[in-house]
């Protein structure tokens, strides 16, 4: 396992549409291992392969929270070629953040429940229902695979403000 660099807005790679994974290979397994290590190190609860400059339809997630004793039991999840096949009419609002847009959080409205179809690390096609934060995280990460960022759901004014801030920061870092 190794840490990978997380690409940051305004990197144009974040707008790429990721390609389907044809087969779960040792390289895909290594990518998944690296993604988990990178996600946990950041720390974050979800990561799409494109965020580590790999335009493949792969997502890692872990929504585990510390228990009463402060211990966190990991609940790693892998979604290969995920697609939302059903969503509720009911909406919910969660404050979202993104490892590729560090230290910026905003409320986003999305379907409260979704059904997702994906391939697991064993190459098995699965379907699963998700609700609450789990559903929000799945939708957020699948958006990444389609070149969509959570700031795209904000007003034009807010989105432009965020883009300007991160573009300036990138220019300063390049100087």
UniProtKB/Swiss-Prot annotation:
**Which reactions are catalysed by this chain?**
N-terminal N-formyl-L-methionyl-[peptide] + H2O = N-terminal L-methionyl-[peptide] + formate
Q: Which residues form the active site?
A: 141
Question: What does the record's cofactor remark say about binding?
Answer: Binds 1 Fe(2+) ion.
Q: Name one GO biological process term.
A: co-translational protein modification
State its cofactor: Fe(2+)
Coiled coil segments of this chain = none
EC number(s) given by UniProt: 3.5.1.88
Q: What family name appears in the similarity comment?
A: Belongs to the polypeptide deformylase family.
List the HAMAP family.
Pep_deformylase
Purpose: Removes the formyl group from the N-terminal Met of newly synthesized proteins. Requires at least a dipeptide for an efficient rate of reaction. N-terminal L-methionine is a prerequisite for activity but the enzyme has broad specificity at other positions.
State the name under which the record lists this protein: Peptide deformylase
